[in-house]
Amino acid sequence: MRTIRPEKQQAVAELKEALQNAKSVVLADNLGLTVAQVTQLRRELRQAGVELKVAKNTLIGIAARELGIEGLEPYLHGTTTLAFSYEDEAAGAKKIREFFAKEREPKFVMKAGILEGKVIDADGVKALADLPNRETLLAQVLAGIQAPLQGVAGAINGLLASFAYALDARIRQLEGAEA
């Protein structure tokens, strides 16, 4: 195994820390982005809790290997930009896709991703980007739970109302018989 220079060891340590702390990572190939585009992308990603880094493929490979992340090597070619999502798993993929949907020609090609320590291919990253955010998913689950409960409550309410109407009718009938 090759020895790594101290400055490279520091870069590997930073990559390892980011890989460990991130909920997901998107690896992308940025083809000819301007400085203004990169700055704007970084700003938008930062607002979503995503950090954008450019790193050497060999250092990414070393950091991944040391963390036990396997299967990343085939995707480590060209210029690799990493988007580390620290809050929402889908935020990085979603924001990158949204940002480049505005461009006429895509200059950012998603290569792969890392989700829960497992490597996913570009199609997996795109599927991750298509997922609704956490709040929307929770709302959908709660709506799914709430709907049957509302149906049961409505049925019980209907039975009670029918019983009340029948009881009221019987009271009127008895009052009419006494008079």
UniProtKB/Swiss-Prot annotation:
Keyword RNA-binding: yes
GO cellular component: large ribosomal subunit
Biological role: Forms part of the ribosomal stalk, playing a central role in the interaction of the ribosome with GTP-bound translation factors.
Coiled coil (UniProt feature): none
Family in the record: Belongs to the universal ribosomal protein uL10 family.
Subunit structure: Part of the ribosomal stalk of the 50S ribosomal subunit. The N-terminus interacts with L11 and the large rRNA to form the base of the stalk. The C-terminus forms an elongated spine to which L12 dimers bind in a sequential fashion forming a multimeric L10(L12)X complex.
GO molecular function: large ribosomal subunit rRNA binding; structural constituent of ribosome
GO annotation terms (biological process): translation
Lineage, top ranks: Bacteria, Bacillati, Bacillota, Clostridia, Eubacteriales
UniProt signal peptide: none
UniProt xrefs under InterPro entries: Ribosomal_uL10 (IPR001790), Ribosomal_uL10-like_sf (IPR043141), Ribosomal_uL10_bac (IPR022973), Ribosomal_uL10_bac_type (IPR047865), Ribosomal_uL10_CS_bac (IPR002363)
UniProt keywords, alphabetically: Ribonucleoprotein, Ribosomal protein, RNA-binding, rRNA-binding
A Pfam family of this chain: Ribosomal_L10
Gene3D superfamilies from the UniProt entry: 3.30.70.1730, 6.10.250.290
Protein's name according to its UniProt entry: Large ribosomal subunit protein uL10
